[in-house]
Amino acid sequence: MALMPLSLPFAELEVGHHLYWQIGDLYLHGQVFLSSWILIGILLAFVLVGTRGMKRDPIGLQNLLEFLWDFIRDLARDQIGEKYYRDWLPFIGTLFLFIFVSNWGGALIPWKIIELPEGELGAPTADINTTVAMALLVSLAYFYAGLSRKGLRFFELYVEPTPIMLPFKIIEEFTKPLSLSFRLFGNILADELAVGVLVYLVPLIVPLPVMLLGLFTSAIQALIFATLAAFYIGEGLHEAH
C-alpha cells in the first residue's frame, strides 16, 4: 500500500518567496525596500511630531524621545568611552532605532493588507541581506575607527600579545559580522515563522503569548546588535593592553 503524503496547514507557509526588482544584472528584494521605507517614514513622522513645540519640561512623545536619546547616549558612552562616543552616537543610534522599529514593525503592523505581485511585506531584519549589510557596516566602522585613530599601528593588535595570535585574530574578524548578522536574522525569522504557524493552527488566543515574547526578544536583539557595534568600535579606538 502506497503511503500518501500528509497535508498540513502550515505546509503552505513559504520562506524566501520574494518580489524582485531588476536593475541591470542586479536583482533586489523589493519587499525589503518597501517595508524599510514604510518603517523609516513612520520613525521620521514619530520624531517630527515629538520634537514639534518642544517644552522645557518634556511630556508625551518628547519625553519618550528624550528617554531614547539618553538610553542610546549611555550605551555608546559605556562601550566607546567619554572621549570618542559623540562622533559615533549617530551611527549607533541609527542602528538601534532601525533594528528596533523593524523588529517591532514586523510583528505589529498588519502587512498582509498590502498586496504585492509576489511575496509579502514583513520585518526587514527577517531578510539575511539586511542583517549582513548592517554587520558589514559595523566591520567597516570598526576598521575606520581604528585606522583613523592609530594609523597603521592599528594592525599591531593582530600580533599582540604574541604573533602566534595572528591567524586567530584574522578568523575573528570574519566571525564578527557572521555572528552579528545570523543572530539577528535567525531570531527574527524564527519568531515570524513560529507566530505564522500558530496563527494557522490556533488563530485566536494561543499565538498572543508567543507574540509578546517575540516583542521582548526583538527589543533585546536590537540592544545586543547596537551594544556589540559600539563595543567593536571602542575596541578599534582604544590602545591594546
Swiss-Prot record:
PANTHER family, per database record:
ATP SYNTHASE SUBUNIT A, CHLOROPLASTIC (PTHR42823:SF3)
Protein encoded by which gene: atpB
Disulfide connectivity for this sequence is none
- Membrane-traversing stretches: 30-50, 89-109, 128-148, 193-213, 214-234
InterPro entries for this protein: ATP_syn_F0_a_bact/chloroplast, ATP_synth_F0_asu, ATP_synth_F0_asu_AS, F0_ATP_A_sf
Its annotated compartments are:
Cellular thylakoid membrane
Task: Name it.
Answer: ATP synthase subunit a
Decide whether keyword Calcium is in the record: no
